[in-house]
Amino acid sequence: SQIPAGFFIAKKGIRGMVALSIFGFSAFTWLMGTATSVLGLKFIRLGLGLTEGPCPVGLASTINNWFPPREKATATGVYIAATMFAPILVPPLAVWIAMTWGWRWVFFSFAIPGLVIAVLWYLLVRTRPSESAFVSKAELETITVGQETPDARRENIVISPGFARLDRLIRVRDLAPVSTVKGLFTSKNILGDCLAYFMMVSVLYGLLTWIPLYLVKEKGFTFMSMGLVASMPCIGGFIGAIFGGYVSDKLLGRRRKPTMMFTAISTVLMMVIMLNIPQSTVAVCVGLFFVGLCLNIGWPAFTAYGMAVADSKTYPIAASIINSGGNLGGFVSPMLAGFLLDKTGSFNSVFIYFGVCAAIGLFVIMLLDEPK
């Protein structure tokens, strides 16, 4: 549902689509609490995915419209960090709700805030700052500075002699923003970002899916002790996303590729470490923390990169292409990791697979151009 949503948002704006998406997946969350059969639950889950799909595209487009170039990666990092914080906070809260009021109330309780937020979004949020009654003239000038001229895209990065060597390495190019749908689907930079994101999301979702079993079967953790340890990648990811967005914006002059490259390289190294990590609770906790940290330092840049390649009108479609690639990786990777585990009986093959994904991601990232 993401690519159709991207086309809709590009034409009609974020206000209605994002509100409808939040309302839709909140309603399906409520319906899960009413399910009486496995088949019914499957159909509800399908509806949940279809209605949830447009939301990331709309949120990324909101950041693109509402933040100046110097803050886009930082804003994206905060948004991504929130998605890392939720898996830390929600599981114990869900257990408490289930133990107190029953499992159905877990779904009812999490649906209600979403329904309220959907209404508030529609009432308060506008597609562009210029359409909002809450934005002052000074704020509007800060957000849109340099974006009203044809040469605006030349200001994507901060040009400085100190970055000369880095700029050669990351292939800084003077590129015109992609302004057509055909241009997006034939852009090596958009498609390359999509493929690299596919590879890195494959690692993240594969880890989140299989880490609990790895801890219990391979490292001998009990189910009680496994909970905190399994959350370490999310804790590291929360810190990494905010830090990575800040570094990309403030320390690297809005360059996106360096943090993307760091994430790919460090993830390969962390997979090697995980292959040889000792049977120690502290070592496993530290290892998983740094896996999440390294993975997420470059995460904001994968989204912010498309903001520099596409223009503001086509970016929702660009975001939908990139996010669809990531979601496909999140769909394929857990199954392939499970297949490898069945065939080899060892988690070493799974970590090798994740390392290969990160290495392929690095190769693709190196081929991308950094828009000047």
Report each predicted region and the residues it spans.
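Helix-to-loop junctions at the C-terminal end of transmembrane segments
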Residues: 1-13, 242-254, 341-342
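Cytoplasmic helix-loop-helix junction between adjacent transmembrane helices
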Residues: 44-83
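Helix-loop-helix hairpin linking two adjacent transmembrane segments in secondary transporters
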Residues: 79-133
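Extracytoplasmic gate region of multi-pass secondary transporters
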Residues: 175-242, 299, 303, 333
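Helix-breaking motifs and short loop linkers at transmembrane-helix boundaries and internal kinks
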Residues: 13, 34-40, 51, 67-68, ...
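Conserved MFS/SLC helix-loop-helix module at the cytosolic interface between two early adjacent transmembrane helices
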Residues: 1-39
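Cytoplasmic membrane-interface "Motif A"-like loop-to-helix N-cap segments
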Residues: 11-22, 249-264
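C-terminal ends and interior cores of transmembrane alpha-helices
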Residues: 23-36, 265-279
